[in-house]
Amino acid sequence: MTENINKEYLKEKQYKSTKYLEARIKIHQFTKNKIGFHEWIFSQYDLSEFKKDNNEIRILDIGCGTGVFWKKNLNNFQNYKLDITFTDATEAMIEKQKINTAELNAKKKYEIADIDNLEKYKNQFDIVFCHNVIYHAGDKEKSIKNLKDCLNDKRSSFCSITTNSEKHMLNVYEIGRNLDKNFPTDRIIDTFTEEIADKMLPKVFKIEKKN
């Protein structure tokens, strides 16, 4: 099913600069977890097969954003041979990604690309990162299938997908509504929550869920 996602709004306002995304990322500093969100994501990966083979790992980062994931995990990736393609829908994100991955020891490519159009990346990658991006897709089912198509046929290849629970930041929205009756209540993240992902992803992937 195709949903009406306003891509022009996302490109020309929400992500034309990095400030809104960076503000949301800062919220994670208030987590109760002992390690940060981005470090926690890395800790869930099993990269032993790649390290054992000592082969180059080809990674596609879809909707790479500002590069904070890579900046936070710079040391975690230092013992791997990496060939990474970073993609995002706006120049602002790509430029910030370049800054935050400048010290990353890897072959790096930076490209403008949208999650709804991934055909050029088919069958190329060992790992696909898609962190908090699928809710921006117009056709979620098609985009999920396209993510899988981007993977190569190696036994160790995998796709890393993150999203939010439907309860995510509801308290913030409640405070906003109490302060301003015109506070926006529509949330694009609600188009692909954890609860929706639990139903959609198993149709395409063999799932290993981490909470």
Name each model feature, range by range.
Residues 126-139:
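A short SAM/SAH-binding and catalytic strip from SAM-dependent methyltransferases
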